[in-house]
Amino acid sequence: MADIDARLREDVHLLGELLGNTIREQRGAEFLDKIERIRKGAKAGRRGSAEGAEQLSSSVDGLGDDELLPVARAFNQFLNLANIAEQYQLMHRRDDKQPLPFESRVLPELLDRLKAEGHSPDALARQLSKLEIDLVLTAHPTEVARRTLIQKYDAIAAQLAALDHRDLNSIERTQITSRLQRLIAEAWHTEEIRRIRPTPVDEAKWGFAVIEHSLWHAIPNYLRKADHALHAATGLHLPLEAAPIRFASWMGGDRDGNPNVTAAVTREVLLLARWMAADLYLRDVDNLAAELSMQQASDALRASVGDSAEPYRAELKRLRERLRATRNWANASLSETLPAPEAVLRDNRELLDPLLLCFQSLHECGMGVIADGPLLDCLRRAVTFGLFLVRLDVRQDSSRHCAAMTEITDYLGLGRYEEWDEQTRIDFLLRELNNRRPLLPSYFKPAADTAEVLATCREVAAAPAASLGSYVISMAGSASDVLAVQLLLKESGLQRPMRVVPLFETLADLDNAGPVIETLLGLPGYRSRLHGPQEVMIGYSDSAKDAGTTAAAWAQYRAQERLVEICREQQVELLLFHGRGGTVGRGGGPAHAAILSQPPGSVAGRFRTTEQGEMIRFKFGLPDIAEQNLNLYLAAVLEATLLPPPPPQPAWRTMMDQMADDGVSAYRAVVRENPEFVEYFRQATPEQELGRLPLGSRPAKRREGGVESLRAIPWIFAWTQTRLMLPAWLGWEAALSKALERGEGEVLAQMREQWPFFRTRIDMLEMVLAKADADIARLYDERLVSAELQHLGAHLRDLLSQACNVVLGLTGQTQLLAHSPETLEFISLRNTYLDPLHLLQAELLSRSRNREASLDSPLELALLVSVAGIAAGLRNTG
């Protein structure tokens, strides 16, 4: 631990020094001295020095308008560099004496444990190879870093790795340090903030870039190591076509609350994915054609290429021509609709078969060592990513489908669909689903919103099945929500089954999820329209915003239990799709622990989850880090499948029922029932300003109104910026305190010790409370909140203190995260750079609100940079 601390601090010190050189060169030594004075004041203030805190405060207050932006930029860059150093620490080269990191050990150790539990080698190999883990990449307004800078940060991490070699001479060390200096200067002189909002297509390209630069390399590497672990434990290998983890995307498909995602955008993103996939395979195949110059070939390969002197090259050149044709067609189709020429690859077998033919031939001819190199990597990519790179999900709000159905029934003279009761809707929808004639005449001219819904359904019908994932219905609450989408898709020409997935988001809808699915599975003809298992999406963000995380977490758990039970009774396979965010307030947290805390039977070899915004970059932005996280997913889903936790004891259920009631009452008493709350929220946080920032393609609000109209992400993002972290803990302080007052501390201790669900919740709560900071939140109140609302802020800080104390009582520690000194070290390291940014942001908000500033004024730009810096410093922001 001390070794990691020392090395981390050494790297941070070096990067900070090089950034200081860059700043001095541009703005002079006097300006750098100001930055240092602010930093040292923050550091001393954190150690309890009143003098240091005063030095920090007076230094920030004394900044002129022209200094606000460069100071904000300096601390933003410090935090990004600290993040790079921390990420590098997670994957740095270790010598033989150091134990492997948990992420590298987790699968081999699990396989040994499963073997000891009595699972046969065959069963283990079979289960591992047929796992279906779907990671769904989504764009979110909290990913504030520009792609240009991300690439520079990756290059900085590579130079830190180069510095880690112990056999460097002084010349080599100087060269690497010079490269680092140059990269840091490039980052400093690159504007870190987008001036214009990204389009949905920009967001999709960002997602493709993560695949190109990281996941493309991580996938074959993690599979190679998984295969090695399996072979070491069982003597068996992973089948060549095993792809336990695949990727889907919402970028370009998620139109819920985002009018910028149109049918045309979805079509463009599907074509771009196809273009990108062909381009990436072309690079692989070019390299393979250069390497595979051998003459010896199997009879099967000879039958394919004839008596060519270079049979492998001949086979690969044919594949290369087809990949070029596919790439050219996809590119040309972006500007006009073109029929696909014969040479275009349509089915993944057309990509896989030539590669397999070469692979098998090499093995047959005694050249297995060659086959198991880059050719095997390419094969595994082809199985994982296919011709379409990612499967695109489509998501739309149930109210949009209801409005479209209402316009249709109105036009047909059948009455208003939105006014019908549920049974009338179901009867009508089933009748039309089973009717062979079209519902609408070809000359039907709908209003713009309905036309867009139908155009999206036509794109879904026209797209290849393998390019699409699920059609997700947000704010679903009834069986008719699912049937309506099935009918709209049928009406648009879809002639194959497709996964139409209800997303249950509010507390009431989660409680009703079981009955809705039970109704659907009992309807005539419904199962024939299912594509694979019954998929159901559990919403974490809106349920937590609606009721607080105590009640939401328990409602999510109970809903999953009921769905498992219903699908087991109905003999239908179930796939649960977890709509998690990056923060605890939106269901985020360490994936490994979260998966192992799911109800027994809910992870039966299948797991689907969203990976969001900035978390994609932190978890999958670098190949080595991506590989570690893929290992964690693989091991957790395998363990949850073969070693599910026992069901909770009746006393624990009773306790959670009571705590959920106490939690939701306490949460809503503040958020819903206090008439001053919304005004306080708007004054104390940068919520209003966040709506103006060009952070993502989606508007921050669904409609005008109070907290309920806000999307879950800006709601969380705003509280994170001020360090109150309110949505992640509010309600827990009351729920846990009341349980202790009732004398149930022993039951709580038992739950934490024996029940993974409860232990994980408390661990995540502890993590977020360790990042919360009442002093920082008070600072925002003092600068920004009117005198008559100050008492509300003080009350919320008291509740935060209560939450911290009750968690410490439960864990038996004197300090939050005392059991994880490494995490505490990372938080402490960042606070030195975060404190000035918080102080600066409060000052900027105050100045901004007291004058009219244009969006590109230094004041607004500095505010943007402060938002980005705090987001970088706290990592999981929304």
From Swiss-Prot:
GO MF, one annotated term: phosphoenolpyruvate carboxylase activity
Catalytic activity entry: oxaloacetate + phosphate = phosphoenolpyruvate + hydrogencarbonate
Domain of life: Bacteria
Gene Ontology, cellular component aspect: cytosol
E.C. designation(s): 4.1.1.31
Cited PROSITE patterns: PEPCASE_1, PEPCASE_2
Lyase listed as a keyword: yes
Entry keyword set: Carbon dioxide fixation, Lyase, Magnesium
Disulfide partners: none
Main function: Forms oxaloacetate, a four-carbon dicarboxylic acid source for the tricarboxylic acid cycle.
Protein name: Phosphoenolpyruvate carboxylase
